[in-house]
Amino acid sequence: MSRPLTPLLDCVLSPLDLRALPASDLARLADELRAEMIDVVSVTGGHLGAGLGVVELTIALHYIFNTPDDRIIWDVGHQAYPHKILTGRRDKIRTLRQEGGLSGFTKRSESIYDPFGAGHSSTSISAGLGMAMASALKAEERRNVIAVIGDGAMSAGMAYEAMNNAGALDARLIVILNDNDMSIAPPTGAMSAHLARLVSRPSYRHLRERIKLFSKKFPKFFSEQASRSEEFARGFLVGGTLFDELGFYYVGPIDGHNFEHLLPVLKNVRAYPNGPVLVHVVTHKGKGYAPAEESADKYHGVNRFDVVTGKQVKAQSTRLSYTKVFSKALIEEATHDHKIVAITAAMPTGTGLDSFAEKFSDRMFDVGIAEQHAVTFAAGIACEGYKPFVAIYSTFLQRAYDQIIHDVSIQKLPVRFAIDRAGFVGADGATHAGSFDIVFLATLPEFVVMAPSDEVELMHMVRTAAVYDQGPISFRYPRGEGIGMDLPQRGEVLEIGKGRVLREGSRVALVCFGTQLSEVLVAADELAAEGISTTVADARFAKPLDKDLMRRLAREHEVFITIEEGAIGGFGAHVLQFLAQEALLEHGLKVRTLRLPDEYLNHGSPEKILSRVGLDAKGIINAVFTSLGYETRKTLQI
């Protein structure tokens, strides 16, 4: 299929070109930009619906504000594809989320038009406030700072912390509330747009401030009544009372797809001399592409798809994903135990808990984008004798670390953590990599940390977590499919802190924590063909370690290598520390720890990246050869 014709967009190489266009051309530009984005994502995959919903808003912001001197901060970054196309990156847009290509999110190192990197939710207002106050400290600068945040991201407490601070500082900050869920939106018709234009005019705001000053000359009772009356009238007509309470001047709601509404309001807001303002813009997720409009949840993040039919291209496979195996196992356990409940932070589909909710709706809790609350909420449930499973991506669990320590671990509450997307995740890059959970959980006293090597082991760990009541317990598993094992109806209960040996050898011990075990077994086969006798062990637990197994392997082998898909300081570090304490390193044992490198890994194919960092079979074999002093095998027939 040929690419769409975009003659007007072809002339826009930067926001300078955009600002040279007459306003009458912007609607046509929006159509072309939307067509280009649909065509791009149909080839690359990525986040579609959010970007389609902000095409007009993106154009309007770059048209009215002097970017990059004025700062536009996109919360999360899912919606930033139109922004990237308009800011000089169109020639690379078809490399989106590919190794060496454009990031799927905003990224400071990628463009001067990306003043702040994103990937996680609800950070934009805090970052914007910091930039606004820095600008205020530079007396010669008068820079506009605009934070664009979705209504979903407003469920996170950090957004309100920032707004409360901005109001207290009376900071010159513009927040665009992109309301694409219609959850808090009053009517957005002609009257609403007219009122928004009216109250956004500097003259109206100036008059309002003068009346406030004048009212202070009267007794306090009269000034308070006047303020309440004005607040009630504005709230009744255009909403925004909550934001007024936080110290923001509220404007809206306005139609985020109508330039006649957007441009005058943004122009008026740009002229405000001081104080924070919130512009409430109502948009439609997936706007302009029927399949995405009709099924916003299915077109939030997409694989490659057919533009005409909207049908997504998915590889045919009989293997279940680890997420689906977890969901199946949890449902099975919940069938046997009415005290099991499931908790997610706005990711029911991504974590597989949507299936759990279909069967146990009263035991499923989606708390919104509120990871800190999710963990302490689970702690409260555990206090009452129930068995909470917090299903969460590894990268998002980082946001609740204080709650894990203070509210769960110190109190030894039996909260179960099902950690999805562990390890390198691929196209979403550094902001979404699940690299650190082993490190930050295994350091906590009496915190059980598990990782399955395959789908059956995952089922065992779900059941083990369900019956474990002595304190917090976690298990981590990657994005993607398992290795295709036949699954039992129900998992088995594992002995805490005990690993297993899959192969016995005499010279080299390969100890794996997690799903790289399949690569370890391939490596062991190749080593055996080279005459190197190899033991393969599945650790199962990073904490508590199987100390008896570690001692035996250290005493009986010449080389001891740990393998994990996690950061420095994880499983291998715990093993090494144990061996040192046991004086098992003093008699010539050669120890190597294979792990993710000490760097943030950018987006790319997981297979290619893991091969590059030495976590595939070839990398494991090379580690063995170098440990033994052999010449490294550059080309291996695997």
UniProtKB/Swiss-Prot annotation:
GO terms for biological process: 1-deoxy-D-xylulose 5-phosphate biosynthetic process; glyceraldehyde-3-phosphate metabolic process; terpenoid biosynthetic process; thiamine biosynthetic process. It catalyses: D-glyceraldehyde 3-phosphate + pyruvate + H(+) = 1-deoxy-D-xylulose 5-phosphate + CO2. Keywords: Isoprene biosynthesis, Magnesium, Metal-binding, Thiamine biosynthesis, Thiamine pyrophosphate, Transferase. Its EC number is 2.2.1.7. One of its GO terms (molecular function) is 1-deoxy-D-xylulose-5-phosphate synthase activity. InterPro entries: Dxylulose-5-P_synthase, THDP-binding, Transketo_C/PFOR_II, Transketolase-like_Pyr-bd, Transketolase_C, Transketolase_CS. Mg(2+) binds at D151, N180. It is an enzyme of class 2 (transferase). Its cofactor is Mg(2+); thiamine diphosphate. Pfam families: DXP_synthase_N (PF13292), Transket_pyr (PF02779), Transketolase_C (PF02780). Binds 1 Mg(2+) ion per subunit. The keyword Ubl conjugation does not apply. Thiamine diphosphate binds at H78, G119, H120, S121, G152, A153, N180, Y289, E371. Pathway: Metabolic intermediate biosynthesis; 1-deoxy-D-xylulose 5-phosphate biosynthesis; 1-deoxy-D-xylulose 5-phosphate from D-glyceraldehyde 3-phosphate and pyruvate: step 1/1. HAMAP family: DXP_synth (MF_00315). Homodimer. Belongs to the transketolase family. DXPS subfamily. Catalyzes the acyloin condensation reaction between C atoms 2 and 3 of pyruvate and glyceraldehyde 3-phosphate to yield 1-deoxy-D-xylulose-5-phosphate (DXP). This is 1-deoxy-D-xylulose-5-phosphate synthase. The gene is dxs.
